[in-house]
């Protein structure tokens, strides 16, 4: 279970970084899929998770 939590935290950190750079949702999803982390973390390919995290952080701003 710890590995799953760590994998999700990596996605959260990635999405947060994209928001700081002013990336759009579509850019963030594309970047997540193309990132090196996607090779070892299947959650980077989960569009729904990336979208949920994007709006979760966007709403917190």
Feature locations, PLM:
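N-terminal acidic leader/helix
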Residues: 1-25
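Short, charge-rich amphipathic interface segments used for partner binding and complex assembly
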Residues: 25-60
